[in-house]
Swiss-Prot record:
Locations listed in the record: Cytoplasm
HAMAP family per the UniProt record, alphabetical: GrpE
Organism, scientific name: Histophilus somni (strain 2336) (Haemophilus somnus)
Principal subcellular localization: cytoplasm
Key words of the record: Chaperone, Cytoplasm, Stress response
Quaternary structure annotation from Swiss-Prot or TrEMBL: Homodimer.
Identification of the protein by name: Protein GrpE
Role noted for this protein: Participates actively in the response to hyperosmotic and heat shock by preventing the aggregation of stress-denatured proteins, in association with DnaK and GrpE. It is the nucleotide exchange factor for DnaK and may function as a thermosensor. Unfolded proteins bind initially to DnaJ; upon interaction with the DnaJ-bound protein, DnaK hydrolyzes its bound ATP, resulting in the formation of a stable complex. GrpE releases ADP from DnaK; ATP binding to DnaK triggers the release of the substrate protein, thus completing the reaction cycle.
Gene: grpE
SUPFAM superfamilies, A to Z: Coiled-coil domain of nucleotide exchange factor GrpE (SSF58014), Head domain of nucleotide exchange factor GrpE (SSF51064)
Any one Pfam family match given in the protein's UniProt record, by short name: GrpE
Length: 195
């Protein structure tokens, strides 16, 4: 081999070595860039998953909050409705004494031949009738009728006695009428029941 060939070969070798050295850092950089890219993709996927979980959690909280608000609104409406229905309860209970007194006055035998007494009795009857119709408009209704079946939710039994013409558990005597206000008992009827 000639000197010139040797020099050329050395130049080629040197050039190859330089090229190899330049390629090595590029490969390392590519490898490092590849690792960084994979890490970045993994991190993005992890953050996306966290975001999805956070959105689901917030949607769940939103649904629960809406349901709670609906429940509160419904309870408030029911409370207002009950307040409207039963605001008159104390007043109605106080009126029951007046109704009882008027009924007792009418049940007392009176000499209706005297015109003054007859007109007084008629006035009491009209007053009672007007009072009963007025309280009925506000949801007050009487309970406790002779012959009705005894109901412990509506009636209070004072005594039980055998009575002809009545079946067992039928009301034979009403000592004091009971009353309901919009379906709720404000005073049970005091009754005697057949055995």
């Amino acid at each position: 081999m000639s000197e010139q060939e040797k020099v050329e070969q050395e130049e080629i070798s040197a050039e190859l070595e330089t090229q190899n050295e330049q390629e090595k850092p590029m490969e390392e950089t590519e490898i490092q860039d590849g690792d960084a890219l994979e890490n970045a993709i993994a991190r993005v996927q992890e953050l996306e998953e966290q975001l999805i979980q956070a959105v689901k959690k917030e949607q769940d909280i939103l649904l629960r909050t809406r349901a709670e608000i609906d429940n509160i609104r419904r309870r408030a409406e029911q409370d207002v409705e009950k307040a409207h229905k039963f605001a008159l309860e104390k007043f109605a209970k106080d009126l029951l004494e007046t109704i009882d007194n008027l009924e007792r006055a009418l049940s007392t035998p009176a000499n209706v031949e005297n015109e003054t007494i007859k007109s007084l009795v008629d006035g009491v009857e009209l007053t009672l009738k007007g009072l009963l119709s007025t309280v009925a408009r506000f949801g007050v209704e009487p309970v406790g009728v002779i012959g009705e079946t005894f109901n412990p939710e509506l009636h209070q039994a004072i005594s039980m006695q055998p009575t002809e013409g009545f079946e067992s558990n039928q009301i034979t005597v009403v000592l004091q009428k009971g009353y309901l206000l919009n379906g709720r008992v404000i005073r049970p009827a005091m009754v005697m029941v057949a055995q």
